[in-house]
């Protein structure tokens, strides 16, 4: 093999390893059967969530996975594969792949990686069902807000009942004064 070709292949393997190391998670999908418009739609969905979606030769991914000790993926490297690297939200790649596969039967989720854990298809689907960070933060803030809102409502109700009680006392005193 010519040296420049070998260097190009080594560069691709290094690129894959770099993406794996930089990503918070990764999902491998079989995109066989997607037409151009569907593939474009999928790429756009990934891009909007800062998920890098790349197609590499299986042999290049094989070398990268072996060098990083990701032997669990080697069994999934057959057919046309693409890899989605989630750079920000660790759930984004899995969530987008799962949602897209639900509407497009030609996209097949094969495996994934989150943190230091290999995920089979079921594992990818499970993490895909976890709400996004923003949704979880909103729910958490809502749970903090609810007791405070109830306390404010209760304090307001007590203040109103005391105000009504003092008005009744004043009106009773006025009535007694008029009667005398």
UniProtKB/Swiss-Prot annotation:
GO terms for molecular function: large ribosomal subunit rRNA binding; structural constituent of ribosome. CDD domains: Ribosomal_L10. Residues 166-180 have a biased composition (Acidic residues). GO terms for biological process: translation. Keywords: Ribonucleoprotein, Ribosomal protein, RNA-binding, rRNA-binding. Gene3D superfamilies: 3.30.70.1730, 6.10.250.290. SUPFAM superfamilies: Ribosomal protein L10-like (SSF160369). GO terms for cellular component: large ribosomal subunit. Residues 161-180 are annotated as: Disordered. Belongs to the universal ribosomal protein uL10 family. Part of the ribosomal stalk of the 50S ribosomal subunit. The N-terminus interacts with L11 and the large rRNA to form the base of the stalk. The C-terminus forms an elongated spine to which L12 dimers bind in a sequential fashion forming a multimeric L10(L12)X complex. Forms part of the ribosomal stalk, playing a central role in the interaction of the ribosome with GTP-bound translation factors. This is Large ribosomal subunit protein uL10. It comes from Finegoldia magna (strain ATCC 29328 / DSM 20472 / WAL 2508). The lineage of its organism: Bacteria, Bacillati, Bacillota, Tissierellia, Tissierellales.
């Amino acid at each position: 093999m010519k040296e420049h070709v070998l260097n190009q292949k080594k560069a691709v393997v290094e690129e894959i390893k770099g993406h794996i190391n930089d990503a918070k998670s990764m999902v491998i999908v079989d995109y066989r059967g997607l037409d151009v418009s569907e593939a474009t739609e999928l790429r756009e969905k990934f891009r909007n969530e800062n998920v890098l979606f790349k197609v590499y030769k299986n042999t290049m991914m094989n070398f990268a996975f072996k060098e990083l000790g990701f032997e669990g993926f080697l069994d999934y490297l057959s057919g046309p594969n693409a890899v989605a690297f989630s750079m920000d939200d660790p759930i984004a790649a899995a969530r987008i792949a799962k949602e897209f596969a639900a509407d497009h039967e030609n996209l097949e989720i094969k495996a994934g990686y989150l943190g230091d854990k290999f995920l089979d298809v079921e594992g990818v689907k499970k993490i895909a069902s976890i709400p996004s960070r923003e949704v979880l933060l909103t729910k958490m803030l809502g749970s903090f807000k609810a007791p405070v809102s109830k306390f404010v409502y209760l304090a307001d109700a007590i203040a109103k009942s005391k105000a009504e009680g003092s008005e009744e006392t004043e009106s009773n005193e006025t009535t007694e004064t008029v009667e005398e």
